[in-house]
From Swiss-Prot:
Protein role: Transcriptional regulator that controls a genetic switch in male development. It is necessary and sufficient for initiating male sex determination by directing the development of supporting cell precursors (pre-Sertoli cells) as Sertoli rather than granulosa cells. Involved in different aspects of gene regulation including promoter activation or repression. Binds to the DNA consensus sequence 5'-[AT]AACAA[AT]-3'. SRY HMG box recognizes DNA by partial intercalation in the minor groove and promotes DNA bending. Also involved in pre-mRNA splicing.
Organism in which the protein naturally occurs: Capra hircus (Goat)
Gene designation per UniProt: SRY
Taxonomic lineage: Eukaryota, Metazoa, Chordata, Craniata, Vertebrata
Subunit composition and interactions: Interacts with CALM, EP300, HDAC3, KPNB1, ZNF208 isoform KRAB-O, PARP1, SLC9A3R2 and WT1. The interaction with EP300 modulates its DNA-binding activity. The interaction with KPNB1 is sensitive to dissociation by Ran in the GTP-bound form. Interaction with PARP1 impaired its DNA-binding activity.
SUPFAM superfamilies: HMG-box
Gene3D superfamilies: High mobility group box domain (1.10.30.10)
GO molecular function, one term: RNA polymerase II cis-regulatory region sequence-specific DNA binding
Name of this protein: Sex-determining region Y protein
Keyword set includes Nucleus: yes
One Pfam family here: HMG_box
GO terms classed as biological process: cell differentiation; male sex determination; positive regulation of gene expression; sex differentiation
């Protein structure tokens, strides 16, 4: 490509230097340059097509050795043709599913001749290709589609990020953290309140029991004094 551009530039320089402007000469040079660039483009397109199909250039030049057929392939060759003729509207995937279902329903006696044929083909394949090793072809990785700079999704995302500097995840994390802190504070306050109520209740019961014990002790201590008084005075003293 660089040589073509250089030859074209040198030709134009010679025309301008000689002060001879001939449209025929310029057209001839343009045609020559265009022919070379078009051939290069076609070669590149063919190579790109092979890469997109997953074919290697070095492997395509060599003869690909097929794997020996197994019993199912031997049986499905003729059966696939019959099913395709009987049901022309069926797709290849649907035919394959039907063949797999039919193969499972066959008995061992019905499968035996196809296994024998597969063994015979395997022996022939070993004799023909003694150093054969199965090497599956690698599929070419398709490039992931990236969003264009003018796509509405990307523009909307950029606008949102411009208006709101904090992302959605950060806001959610902060909101969740604040909610957890508030719930923790509430739970701690409830626990503290319950503990204070329990202590107050326990202290009230303790004081009440202590007062009752003190009253009983005082009554038992003053009991001889109550007996020495007259009945009316003792009742009045107790009521007082």
């Amino acid at each position: 490509m660089n040589r073509t551009v250089q030859s074209y530039a040198s030709a134009m320089f010679r025309v301008l230097k000689d002060d001879v402007y001939s449209p025929a000469v310029v057209q001839q040079q343009n045609t020559f340059a265009f022919g070379k660039t078009s051939s290069l483009c076609t070669d590149n397109h063919s190579a790109n097509d092979q890469c997109e199909r997953g074919e290697n250039v070095t492997e395509s030049s060599q003869d690909h050795v097929k794997r020996p057929m197994n019993a199912f392939i031997v049986w499905s060759r003729e059966r696939r043709r019959k099913v395709a003729l009987e049901n022309p509207k069926l797709q290849n995937s649907e035919i394959s599913k039907q063949l797999g279902y039919e193969w499972k329903r066959l008995t061992d006696a019905e499968k035996r001749p196809f296994f024998e044929e597969a063994q015979r083909l395997l022996a022939i394949h070993r004799d023909k290709y003694p150093g054969y090793k199965y090497r599956p072809r690698r599929k070419a990785k398709r490039p992931q589609k990236s969003l264009d700079a003018d796509s509405p999704i990307l523009c909307n995302q950029m606008d949102v990020e411009t208006l709101h500097p904090f992302t959605y995840r950060d806001d959610c994390a902060k909101t969740t953290h604040s909610q957890m802190e508030s719930q923790l504070c509430r739970s701690q306050s409830l626990i503290l309140t319950n503990s204070l109520l329990q202590k107050e209740h326990h202290s009230s019961w303790t004081n009440l029991g202590h007062d009752r014990v003190t009253l009983d002790t005082r009554i038992s201590a003053d009991f001889p004094f109550y007996q020495s008084l007259e009945p009316g005075l003792s009742c009045a003293y107790v009521q007082y």
